[in-house]
Structures are given as structure tokens and as C-alpha cells.
Amino acid sequence: MAFQDLLGHAGDLWRFQILQTVFLSIFAVATYLHFMLENFTAFIPGHRCWVHILDNDTVSDNDTGALSQDALLRISIPLDSNMRPEKCRRFVHPQWQLLHLNGTFPNTSDADMEPCVDGWVYDRISFSSTIVTEWDLVCDSQSLTSVAKFVFMAGMMVGGILGGHLSDRFGRRFVLRWCYLQVAIVGTCAALAPTFLIYCSLRFLSGIAAMSLITNTIMLIAEWATHRFQAMGITLGMCPSGIAFMTLAGLAFAIRDWHILQLVVSVPYFVIFLTSSWLLESARWLIINNKPEEGLKELRKAAHRSGMKNARDTLTLEILKSTMKKELEAAQKKKPSLCEMLHMPNICKRISLLSFTRFANFMAYFGLNLHVQHLGNNVFLLQTLFGAVILLANCVAPWALKYMNRRASQMLLMFLLAICLLAIIFVPQEMQTLREVLATLGLGASALANTLAFAHGNEVIPTIIRARAMGINATFANIAGALAPLMMILSVYSPPLPWIIYGVFPFISGFAFLLLPETRNKPLFDTIQDEKNERKDPREPKQEDPRVEVTQF
């Protein structure tokens, strides 16, 4: 908590805080573009079996009697239960007798059929090329589209573990810059992948870097923020997701080839990597990790960028050591290991509850976000609506962070999310508008709850173990994200089953917030001792105290 007093010695850092937050937010937009990429690159177009008499260019009119395309389709492809051409079967031999039925429904159950042994013909109106058309991920292989989404989310799960550990050890800025370069390289290579296996491997590596980027971006913003800027800073760090999803819909609408789309969202990372050298390391992290000289250097840089010309006079090593005396003494001690953290009942309880609530929210969040094709016919419009409602939720977040209790607001939002998801089950496919409204409302509730959860998680965990704890939370969140696309495979057995799973978890997790402490308008904990002192003296800070009031700026 003494770090806030140290920032007071540095003067008003609002200019630096805004500039660094804006830079990180712009970079985060590029990161979020990768999250929902498979909504378009793995789009499943309409398809049917390739048949010789219909699709072979060498077949002449003499062979077919100049029959129309509809007639040739009728004798070559059987109809499914909805009287539409089958997607995965064809007649072994042309059924010429079907030409003379005059509109009656044919009985083709006795006709010999076979799978699409010669491949498929795809409807390329929506997309000229996707990974589905590239590697024929349809029919028996259609579940591989969920696998493609799963491997990216699995990479995010691993990134949540590695990112937190490496960030605590090497610093926020170093991990950020490394991950920018990693996404640039593996994302570009994914566009040129010759096989589905190589593509999935590269997307896995992209997921590792993407999660580390998001986690470290939020931490870097939060750890430089004064109390007055804390809520707005975290909110600005979350806004890029909505902007990115709307941007992705526009890019996918303009670029219908998955190779080019993959390149467009990956190549800019080379520029981001070069420009990220402007970012400053977290002075709070440096001081807490017993590097006061380096922390002082970063503080002076921040003060200079905010226009403070006398930073060297107002910020000295003596002032830093006297202000942060307790924190520096704590830094001399060995950091708690993961096993030691598990023996801290209160910290362990908080991490467990945060992890479960994040798991439930992310299961629903990605269940909606990764399956826009299951919710509406126009994936471009629905993705844009999703992005808009996420952005709106993030705009509402500063008000919610300032005026609403953390626990009550998150509990209500999770209940709303559960209701929307479970209601989708009872809305027929024909009522597309209502399904889209419910999905959009549910996603907005999930996005707002997610922003509040990031703030709440930062507020209940001390700085010295915050990155590690957030890494654990991110791991559970990304386990849910990885499982979300796999849940859709269960629709083969029962179409409502995935949506039941998506809806039940948020409902249960809503009650878990009652077990977490209320942290609105309270400063961040820097050490384990700060957290213990707060439990011994849990007095609410006065609202009029400018040091602890959370305002928009």
C-alpha cells in the first residue's frame, strides 16, 4: 500500500498512465483478434458430396441429356429428414427414376448409398476458403473444427500458467515483448501451414502467447495505477476485446480467404514488438522484488513523461527506501512457493473461489463467442453485435466499479447470464432474432462480470503473489475456454446439452461471490502482511478520502 504514497512523491502521473494504458490497449486489440479467429477461418460452409455426373467438367451434355443442375442433383444426392440434400452421402448410381416423380416425396431408403469417397463440393458464397475447405473438416471429420478451437484455448491455459510464473520471475515488460514476437512468428507461419496438424500446433503456441499478453497487460496497467485511475485503467485494459471482435467481423467480411485473414491479424505484431520498447516495467514489481534502484529509475521515467522536470529531486533512493521500508524488508524474505501458498488458508480460499467463478464465466463466455454459427445465420452481424455489447459492458464497468459492490454486482450478472443461456434451449431455430437477442444479452452480462472479476481479483490478492495467483485463475478460466468448444460435440447426442452445461455453471458460481471479501474503494495489498492487517482491521475507508476514492480519472 505504501507504493501509493511513493507515487505521490512522483507527482501527478496521469499523463503517463493514460499514454501507457492507451498503448497497451491498442496492442491488446491485436491480441484479441486471435481469440475468435476460428469463427471465420473455421466456418463450416454448406457442402455435399462430389459426384461424377454433376461436377466432372469432362461430362458433356450428350451424357446427361442437357438436364438442369437441380435435376442432376436430385438423381445424385439423397434428401435428409428436412428434405434437403444430404451433406455426407450420395447415391452409388444415379437414380433416374426420381426424375419422373412430379413433386412427390421419393422413397430412397432402398437405394444404394455411400459416403463422399471423392470429396465434397462447398458453397463458397460466404468464404472462398477456410480451414474446413482446405482439409475437408466435414462429416466424420467435422469435430476437428472444435479441436482447432480447443488447441488455441489449451494454449491459453498453458499460457496462464507460464505467463504468471515467468512474469513474477523476469518482469511484466520482458514477458510482454517476448510474447509479441512469438505471436508475430507463429501466427504468420500458421497462415502457411501445409497440414492441419501443423496448423493446430502453431495455434497452440499462439494461444500460449495470447493469454500471457492479456494477463500481463492487465497487471501492468493495474500496478502503475493510482487509486483515482485504478478502475478506469483496468476498464480501458478490457475494452480492446469488444473493439477487436467488431474489427474482426469487418476484416472477415472484407477478406474471405483464411490464409490472408490469418496474415492480416499476425504480421502487425512485428511492428508492435518494435514499438513496445517504449513501455516501462512495473516499478511496483521491481521494488517488491528487492530491486529498488531499478524501480526508482522507472518511476523517474514515468514522472519525466508526465512533464515533471524535477523528478530527480523529488524521487530519491532515500525517499523510496523510507516509504517502502516494510515492503523492502518483506522482499528480503523468500517468496511464498506454490506449496506455501496452499498452506495459507485465506489466500488459498480466495484463489479457489476466484478460479471457480472465472471457470464458470469463461465456460459460458466462450460457449457463446466460439459458436456464432450455431446462434444465427449471419456470422458477421452476430460477431459485430457481440463486440458492441462487450464494448458497452466495458463502458458501463467504471460506473459499476465506483458505485456497486463487487460481490452483489457479479452475482446478479452471473444469474442473468445463466437465465439467457438456459432460455436459448427453448427458442426454436426459426426464431433467429430472439436467439440472437438472448445470446447478445447473456454475453454482455458475462463481459461485464469478467471486467469486475479482473478488478476484484487484483484487489483481494497481494502484489507479491498477484501474478502467480492470476496465472492460476487464468488456468482455470482457460480450462473452461478449452472445454467450451468440446462441449458442442455433445450436441450430436442431445442438441440442448451444451447449452445446459453453459448455463448451469454460471448459476452455481453466482453464490460463490458471497464468500469473497468486499473490496470496493480499498487500496491494493502489496504484501501478505497487508492482507492480514486488513482482516484484523476491516474498516471501510471514508468515501471523501481522496487517497482511496475510485473515480473515473
Swiss-Prot record:
PROSITE patterns: MFS. Changing N521K: In a colorectal cancer sample; somatic mutation. Disulfide bonds: none annotated. InterPro entries: MFS (IPR011701), MFS_dom (IPR020846), MFS_trans_sf (IPR036259). It catalyses: butanoate(out) + estrone 3-sulfate(in) = butanoate(in) + estrone 3-sulfate(out); propanoate(in) + estrone 3-sulfate(out) = propanoate(out) + estrone 3-sulfate(in); pentanoate(in) + estrone 3-sulfate(out) = pentanoate(out) + estrone 3-sulfate(in); dehydroepiandrosterone 3-sulfate(in) + butanoate(out) = dehydroepiandrosterone 3-sulfate(out) + butanoate(in). The chain crosses the membrane at residues 16-36, 144-164, 178-198, 204-224, 234-254, 260-280, 351-369, 379-399, 408-428, 437-457, 470-490, 496-516. GO terms for molecular function: organic anion transmembrane transporter activity; short-chain fatty acid transmembrane transporter activity; sodium-independent organic anion transmembrane transporter activity. The keyword Translocase does not apply. Its main location: membrane. It is a multi-pass membrane protein. Keywords: Cell membrane, Glycoprotein, Lipid transport, Membrane, Transmembrane, Transmembrane helix, Transport. Residues 1-15, 165-177, 225-233, 281-350, 400-407, 458-469, 517-553 are cytoplasmic. GO terms for cellular component: basolateral plasma membrane. Specifically expressed in liver (also at protein level). It is found in: Basolateral cell membrane. Glycans are attached at N39, N56, N102. Sodium-independent organic anion transporter, exhibits high specificity for sulfated conjugates of xenobiotics and steroid hormones such as estrone 3-sulfate (E1S) and dehydroepiandrosterone sulfate (DHEAS). Can transport the statin pravastatin and may contribute to its disposition into the hepatocytes when the function of OATPs is compromised. It is specifically activated by 3 to 5 carbons-containing short-chain fatty acids/SCFAs, including propionate (propanoate), butyrate (butanoate) and valerate (pentanoate). Belongs to the major facilitator (TC 2.A.1) superfamily. Organic cation transporter (TC 2.A.1.19) family. This is Organic anion transporter 7. The gene is SLC22A9.
